[in-house]
């Protein structure tokens, strides 16, 4: 059994929705055990509430549990072309795992969201840098998801990983195409993890 962790941070719910789609795709793969968790919130509760943050029910992960998984699919909103501060804070606590090589050879993939589309690819590739330092095997999705060829509408989605465009005010929710790409990413990564674990 290959253990897959979908680990995310979501303030307004877009990445949370994408995380569930990623997990749905991963759950299609026989031999995959899928867990969804989130990184801890670092904002003060009153500031989080004033900013319109959405309460989420996923359990909170700890850095120490990451070696328990064969693949980790990270989800983070874009903050100025980078991962969110909450995800950065979480990953900055993995120094002990890095020192011991605990994540070496594990699969890693990334999905993201942006307000207007700016920085979605940069967020994914800049997150890869941290994962590469851990010796993780980075898994992009390429162009196998046919939705990536559709240019008839505004949508997220890149060969690097699934994305969604939330709109400047956060009112746009992930489209069916974006969710389909996210499901593909989950299924693809889980399939690789099962093969490598087999």
Curated annotation (Swiss-Prot):
Give GO cellular component annotations, separated by semicolons: membrane
Record-linked PROSITE patterns: FLAVODOXIN_LIKE
Task: Please give the Gene Ontology molecular function terms for this protein.
Answer: flavin adenine dinucleotide binding; FMN binding; NAD binding; NADH:ubiquinone reductase (non-electrogenic) activity; NADP binding; NADPH dehydrogenase (quinone) activity
Q: Name all Flavodoxin-like domain ranges.
A: 4-189
Q: What top-level class of enzyme does the UniProt entry assign?
A: oxidoreductase
Does Calcium appear among the keywords?
no
Q: Which cofactor does it need?
A: FMN
Keywords per UniProt? Flavoprotein, FMN, NAD, NADP, Nucleotide-binding, Oxidoreductase
InterPro entries, A to Z:
Flavodoxin/NO_synth, Flavoprotein-like_sf, Flavoprotein_WrbA-like, FMN_Rdtase-like_dom, NQO
| Chain residues that bind substrate | 98
Keyword Iron-sulfur among record annotations: no
Specify the domain of life of the species encoding this protein: Bacteria
Note on cofactor: Binds 1 FMN per monomer.
Residues bound to NAD(+) are 12
Catalytic reactions of this protein: a quinone + NADH + H(+) = a quinol + NAD(+); a quinone + NADPH + H(+) = a quinol + NADP(+)
Q: At which positions is FMN bound?
A: 10-15, 78-80, 113-118, 133
Q: What is its EC number?
A: 1.6.5.2
What HAMAP family does UniProt report for this protein, alphabetically?
Answer: NQOR (MF_01017)
> What family, per the record?
Belongs to the WrbA family.
Name listed for the protein in its UniProt record: NAD(P)H dehydrogenase (quinone)
Q: What is the lineage of its organism?
A: Bacteria, Pseudomonadati, Pseudomonadota, Gammaproteobacteria, Enterobacterales
């Amino acid at each position: 059994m290959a253990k897959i962790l979908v680990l995310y941070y979501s303030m307004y719910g877009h990445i949370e929705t994408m995380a569930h789609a990623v997990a749905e795709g991963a759950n299609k793969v026989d031999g995959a055990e899928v867990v969804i968790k989130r990184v801890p919130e670092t904002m003060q509760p009153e500031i989080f509430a004033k900013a319109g943050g959405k309460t989420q029910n996923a359990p909170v992960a700890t850095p120490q549990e990451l070696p328990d998984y064969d693949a980790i699919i990270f989800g983070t909103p874009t903050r100025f072309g980078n991962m969110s501060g909450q995800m950065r804070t979480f990953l900055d606590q993995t120094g002990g795992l890095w020192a011991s090589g605990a994540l070496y050879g594990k699969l890693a993939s990334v999905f993201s969201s942006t307000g207007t589309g700016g920085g979605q690819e940069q967020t994914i590739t800049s997150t890869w840098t941290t994962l590469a330092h851990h010796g993780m095997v980075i898994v992009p999705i390429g162009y196998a998801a046919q939705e990536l060829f559709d240019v008839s509408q505004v949508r997220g989605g890149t060969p690097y990983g699934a994305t969604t465009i939330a709109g400047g005010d956060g009112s746009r929710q992930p489209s069916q195409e974006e969710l389909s790409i996210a499901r593909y990413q989950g299924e693809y990564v889980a399939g690789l993890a099962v093969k490598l674990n087999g």
